[in-house]
């Protein structure tokens, strides 16, 4: 494992370097120098996470070899909490209570289990304070203040499922201390990654408070924001967090189960819409903070809702955008073709290079993206985003950033194409991609 990760680090160093990126981006908490890699529960597990299910995915992440390629986060999303008719049930200090019917050993034990596998543990929360905390007027840990002292009951936060979260008035004494107590609890449980969901422009004070609180714990906790964040606040998200979701959910919610759960997990329209947002947000990404395109739905073959070509294109776009690579599939039933995709260290190296690519061609279904390596080479991705008919996609080397000829290597196959003069052309099937490294001559 160490040798492979060391090789990836060398590859990333080769790609990123002087002239390859701007100054360090995002939070200066020293975390997420490269985009996070791992697995998240929402796409596949959805509303029914349990201790056993999360452990099974952690086991698979480790035993499949994905961990050896850098996929190390096991992230528990929503529905770890217990709800009643008034919203979230709370502990004695007004924080969400764990649903012990799902997690009988508690969250710390689950985090310890992940850590024992050489993995990291991620967790989930939303802004605000629970209605039940205000109704009970629970004390704020370590202070003389109570929930009613800090709640703005005239406004409710966006909480997608349990609901009934009031805004916090951060001008009130005790507000920061409440968030501090929650962050301290998460740190004591061994949380390594925290996703705060339902964030919008009105939640900047919450993001500031959580950033401050997480730092104060003394534990390194990767701080992720979700979802569909307004780009108008891009500089703020960049300053405070380690990643931010640039669009709504990748899931199509078109499965046969309740609330659209089950397979398929996504569809091509939900993936192809990411090309536009990746281009719009490109300038905000860099070491310390990344544009999050959402879960990578690779691992379960075609049943996830994408063809093999579309899955390769999805991975290619995520890698070119330097997005976090958080798998949303069932790793206990890992498809062989998909495993080969996910363990392609050339693709992972492109994602982990610290550079978000820019789009240089966008014409109908034809897209071309490029990024420059520290040694003067370029990584170039060509796409046919259409759903019918082949497309001949071309790019001039002058559009990529140089002139003359180049030695070309296909990064998906590893095969050297040879010398190509002036431009590069590929005929691509619907949803297909070509990812190359070009070494100017």
State each model region's role.
Residues 419-441:
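C-terminal beta-strand-rich structural cap/linker in extracellular carbohydrate-active enzymes
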